[in-house]
Amino acid sequence: MIKNIRTTHIGSVLMALIAIVIMIMRPFNDLDDTAHIMLAGIIIALCIWIFKPFKLTYAIGGLVLALFGLLIELPPTVIFSGFTQPALWTLIPAFFFGYTLQKTGLGRRIAMAVIKICRPTYISLIFAWIPIGVALSILTPATTVRVAIMLPIAVQCCELFNLKKGSKGNSLIILTAFAMALIPGSGWLTGVIWGPFIQGQMAGAGIMVTFGDWIGVLLVPVAIATTLLVIGGLLVLKPDEMLSPQAIEAIKKQHPAKMSKDEITSAIILVAVFVASLTGGLHGLSTAVICIAAMLCFFIFGVLETKDFNSAANWNLIIFIAMAFSLGPLFSATGISEWLAGIVVPALEPIAGNPWLFVFAAALFMFIWSLIDVAMFLPTISIMAPILPRIQEAYQVDPLVWIAIFILAGNAFFLAYQNMWAVMSRSIAGNRAWTNQHQGKYGLIYFIACLLALVVAVPIWINAGLFG
């Protein structure tokens, strides 16, 4: 019986008990009764998002937030403010972009085209995943879609090469495909699902984050971390098996079908989205306007049909993110933001005076915290975003610095349960999946790569005035 008790069960019970104690005892002098009730509701929502008791979904946690907000009679404009965030209307089209890549076969075509130019060496094959990940990240921020496209191809490669299951070579190929689906797109706002999410959270806190802001703070460290991870993976997980030249030739002999009209149309639209987002300073259109226009084009040109509307978007995740966007206004309306700021801001004082100490201490804490917050790091970002202006006011640390730390730490994957896309990748790979030992080593390489990337990034951020 005791063996069947999981960490998730213990965590769920503890968080539920904390919420009950807060509602009954009202222990915080700086919070009134409504704030205590709302805080309890937030803790229950976080419990659902992190531990998923009774297999409850992300959307259910969002509905718990709405319920508690209505119970204490907050205005609907506060409770449901997340649904009016432009970032949400960037995210919804993003799901359609990913669905289009899968439906038309464009994503697989791009990936296979890159694999076919490889030489029969591990170095060539491993580095091939970088342009595949970058290309797919330009076309869609949906990491789930990129994983769904790239992992089956990686598995096919391992089978064609007849690599031993659980071997270093097998794990290296699968892990690299997963990592390149996850990490490179973090360098720009529309390359990862966190982009629209963080943009919305920051907007709720009165901070505007543009496409250019995101690239300025994250492109360099992400590029460095990506490159170092691939190189480190080759060194630490150096395969014992040789690759068969005949296997590469077998892949090259797979002749793809002629590119369809839908694929061509999709490619034009998706590239146009990226270019338009990159040149926003010239034409003045917001990312939300660009993405919604592109989504409409898919339907107008017949790439998507009405029946695709329900299939394309993950409405469970959309409701969750919309309600998470509402956390900032909920915090402000109930006074929780001020209360949290009174705890967090003084706690940062010992490290805030030195940019190097601040960045590395905060990054180390967030990497450790990622072992607890396994809900894509979204709950942590939701809690921190409303108090970042207070941190900036106290210590002149620009919120953009926090965004970089959130993203780098949020991608961590030391342990099997820690990263939802790692879990998804292992599921897709089946008996071809990497071993826990190989994942641990690869995750440690990523952590070290991020620290080295920050060594380069911190001087850039200092020169950019992000530390006052």
Annotate each PLM feature.
Residues M1-N4, Q156-P239, A422-G468:
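Membrane-core helix-loop-helix motifs of multi-pass transport proteins
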